[in-house]
């Protein structure tokens, strides 16, 4: 499989890890759009949210809470974004969520 995020999970491509558990990996975005910009991905490959099962989405939700706390954005707020499909502008076809925060974000959907 030629998936960028699967290669990161396998350790073939380095990342700046923020958090990891059995099901989810969270790491810093290489092109941050906010002072805090972390990607959260399931370790099991799935193309997008349409392929995600309940157990995986629950694990991602718990990881989002943990990362928001670790990054110090839980109290003041943050944004979660997941693009799905071509019209949703999904660029990497492995389910992922962007956690953005660390400053007052613009109204523009990032």
Q: Model-derived features: where do they sit?
A:
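HIT superfamily nucleotide-processing domains
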Residues: 1-110
């Amino acid at each position: 499989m030629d998936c960028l995020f699967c290669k990161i999970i396998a350790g073939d491509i380095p990342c700046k890890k923020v958090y990891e558990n059995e099901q989810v990996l969270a790491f810093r975005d290489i092109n941050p759009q906010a002072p805090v910009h972390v990607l959260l991905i399931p370790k099991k490959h799935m193309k997008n949210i349409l392929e995600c099962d309940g157990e995986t989405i629950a694990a991602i939700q718990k990881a989002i809470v943990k990362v928001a706390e670790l990054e110090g954005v839980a109290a003041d707020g943050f944004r979660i974004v997941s693009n799905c499909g071509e019209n949703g502008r999904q660029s990497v076809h492995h389910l992922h969520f962007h956690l953005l925060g660390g400053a007052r974000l613009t109204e523009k959907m990032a």
